[in-house]
Regions:
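Hydrophobic repeat-domain scaffold segments
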Residues: 73, 92, 98, 167-274
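Buried hydrophobic packing segments
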Residues: 38-41, 165-166, 196
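Structural motif
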Residues: 23-33, 50-51, 83-92, 156, ...
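Extended helical regulatory/linker subdomains that flank P-loop NTPase cores
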Residues: 16, 47-52, 56, 60, ...
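A residue-level signal for conserved active-site and pocket-lining positions in enzyme catalytic cores
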Residues: 1, 34, 97, 196
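Active-site-adjacent structural elements in folded domains
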Residues: 21-26, 79-84, 132, 149, ...
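Amphipathic alpha-helical segments of the small helical/lid subdomains adjacent to P-loop NTPase cores
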Residues: 2-40, 61, 134-135
Length: 274
């Protein structure tokens, strides 16, 4: 990352600030693992002079770079398809496709199935003058959002993009409460839920549902779950615009979980000693 940034940015001060920001969070560090995504972070940083601290804004910045800034950077003229399918509608299309596959637990898609799903979603969006095949080609070749992993076997180019677009779908349909319930029961939805929470204008109602559920189902009956503990910590540390009193509730909840874990560990030790 350090070597790449120093080669990318002519100004050493700018390179230093970028490196500091890129290494400041796990989300940005994950994106720095591949040259393409590291390039996108650099392009995004050139526009905004900052690296977003919350995961949803970070991935949105990279998606925007892929959908628009990447072509500008490479001096690629917008195709006829791009004129028919706007930046916003591409995002909507990708969010619907991502959620369909994610909810089914499918992360790798056969080309014929992917084009079928794209065609169905294009029809629902009333996009009439482009084909699913041309959309797939553009999303793969021009934008790098899909990648062919093996012969006619595709996936999103980064799992985080699949999760991000799935989160966009839940937020767009105002179903983040449903997403919260899924996240409590199924770890695969954890990142999706956290990004959805960060994308909400007011996530406090959803956060309160999680708070009460954890209190009633885990703290009061004395049931410790390490996954739920981690989820509580992630919500507390997230970039979601939570009210101060809600953050205080989650800080209290984290203490409750720690006390519960210690208490149960001590009880187990006493049983073993006995």
């Amino acid at each position: 990352v350090v070597k790449f940034a120093k080669q990318w940015f002519a100004d050493g001060h700018t390179a230093g600030k970028f490196i500091e920001g890129a290494q400041s969070s796990k989300s940005s560090a994950d994106l720095c693992r591949t040259p393409l995504l590291l390039t996108l972070l650099c392009i995004s940083y050139e526009y905004s002079r900052s690296i977003p601290s919350d995961r949803a804004e970070l991935y949105e910045s990279c998606v925007d770079a892929l959908l628009f800034r990447w072509d500008v950077f490479r001096s690629i003229e917008r195709s006829n398809l791009s004129k028919e399918l706007s930046h916003a509608r591409k995002k909507l299309l990708l969010s619907r496709v991502a959620r369909r596959y994610f909810d089914e637990g499918v992360f790798f898609f056969r080309k014929n199935d992917l084009t079928r799903v794209l065609a169905e979603e294009l029809s629902d969006l009333e996009v009439k003058f482009v084909t699913a095949e041309s959309v797939l080609f553009e999303l793969e070749a021009h934008h790098g959002l899909f990648i062919e992993r093996a012969d006619k076997l595709y996936s999103f180019s980064h799992l985080s993009f699949h999760e991000f677009f799935t989160a966009l779908s839940y937020v767009g349909e105002n179903k983040v409460i449903d997403l919260a319930i899924l996240a409590i029961d199924d770890p695969k939805y954890r990142e999706v839920f956290l990004m959805g929470l960060e994308k909400m204008y007011d996530p406090n109602e959803v956060a309160m549902i999680i708070f009460r559920y954890v209190k009633d189902e885990f703290i009061k009956p004395g049931q410790y779950d390490p996954y739920v503990d981690r989820l509580v910590q992630d919500i507390s540390a997230s970039g979601a615009p939570l009210h101060r009193d809600m953050r205080e509730r989650f800080a209290e909840l984290m203490v409750d979980m720690q006390v519960l874990q210690i208490t149960l560990s001590e009880e187990d030790s006493e049983i073993d000693d006995g």
